[in-house]
């Protein structure tokens, strides 16, 4: 689908390992199944609770439009996006930092940091899997729990 810059299945390895900081937010540490990526993400656990060993699909996209065109830049309550209906949890945010491991080797590690209204995400793995990320780009996060 157009506009998707990352798509993989993740498994929750731990929940709030450093203790719970906020009443309605949990920090999840997850591992990807296909691309060997590490994900740390804050999620409103009151709206979308996850527990250890839960599996979910994570999609990161630059637009919700199926045709891949950029969004209008303002909220339209009449707009219908079929992409949203396929997922259970959706957030909108911005990439605020990209960080490499400075090892100087080909295919090194890269970490992309994004904020979704203060809920933070770090996605880390091989740089080739994060080539579509840029600092200050707008980003949609879409999640759906899976059974397998």
From Swiss-Prot:
GO molecular function: DNA binding; DNA-directed RNA polymerase activity
GO aspect biological process, one term: DNA-templated transcription
Protein keywords: DNA-binding, DNA-directed RNA polymerase, Nucleus, Transcription
Coiled coil: none
Subcellular location: Nucleus
SMART domains: RPOL8c
Pfam family, one: RNA_pol_Rpb8
Residue ranges, annotated region (Non-specific ssDNA binding): 16-40
Listed GO CC annotations: RNA polymerase I complex; RNA polymerase II, core complex; RNA polymerase III complex
Function: DNA-dependent RNA polymerase catalyzes the transcription of DNA into RNA using the four ribonucleoside triphosphates as substrates. Common component of RNA polymerases I, II and III which synthesize ribosomal RNA precursors, mRNA precursors and many functional non-coding RNAs, and small RNAs, such as 5S rRNA and tRNAs, respectively.
Family: Belongs to the eukaryotic RPB8 RNA polymerase subunit family.
Record text on subunit structure and interactions: Component of the RNA polymerase I (Pol I), RNA polymerase II (Pol II) and RNA polymerase III (Pol III) complexes consisting of at least 13, 12 and 17 subunits, respectively. Directly interacts with POLR2A.
Protein name: Probable DNA-directed RNA polymerases I, II, and III subunit RPABC3
Annotated organism of origin: Caenorhabditis briggsae
Lineage: Eukaryota, Metazoa, Ecdysozoa, Nematoda, Chromadorea
């Amino acid at each position: 689908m157009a506009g998707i810059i990352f798509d993989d299945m993740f498994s929750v390895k731990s929940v709030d390992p450093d203790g719970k900081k906020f009443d309605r937010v949990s920090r999840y540490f997850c591992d990807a199944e296909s691309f060997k990526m590490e994900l740390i993400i804050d999620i409103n656990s009151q709206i979308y609770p996850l527990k250890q060993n839960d599996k979910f699909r994570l999609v990161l996209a630059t637009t919700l439009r199926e045709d891949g065109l950029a969004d209008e830049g303002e909220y339209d309550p009449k707009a219908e996006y079929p992409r949203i209906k396929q997922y259970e949890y959706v957030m909108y945010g911005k990439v605020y930092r990209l960080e490499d491991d400075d090892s100087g080797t080909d295919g090194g590690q890269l970490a992309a940091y994004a904020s979704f209204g203060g809920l933070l995400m770090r996605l880390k793995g091989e740089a080739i899997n994060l080539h579509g990320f840029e600092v200050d780009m707008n980003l949609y996060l879409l999640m759906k729990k899976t059974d397998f």
